[in-house]
Amino acid sequence: MAPADELKAFQDNQLIVGIMIMLFVGIFTYMAKSLLQVAQAVKVPDEWYMYLRMLIIIMLATLFVGMSTWMVISEETTVESFVMVGLVGDSVDAIQIVTGSFAFFILTVFALKNGAGNVIFRVLIAILGVLAVLDILGLLIADLDLEDSIGFITWILWSLCIVGIGVLGLTTKEA
């Protein structure tokens, strides 16, 4: 079965789509709550904490909108409308990348400035800060066509760092 046929079969099964949407919403909302808890733990000042909350809300909203652009493609979709939905999805994804990158950058700055956590935590949070800058540069430097390669690499490293920080938070009281 071709990948396009597999995606169409997935989208036609409304029960699976509904379950996937609920799982994604739950997981990413929990992640957002955890990011705010990390911000409190690293002592982000109130003004920056307010900015961080706004960025995380926008990041979540655009993430869910971006997911909906590929989960609910109808039978009447034409090539032109599919291309348009793809362009809108790319724009929404760019907003999500920018807001997420700024949120992680704020966390990084205050975690390193305040010396929060142990050395492993500081290294992981510093990597997140570097990845945030790389994601922004990947969007800004469109002529180099680096967005896909940088995005893929940073996506993997984001995941590893966030899992590492989560494990540290569960296993130690310092992180």
Predicted regions and their residues:
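Hydrophobic, aromatic-enriched alpha-helical segments typical of multi-pass transmembrane helices
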Residues: 1-175
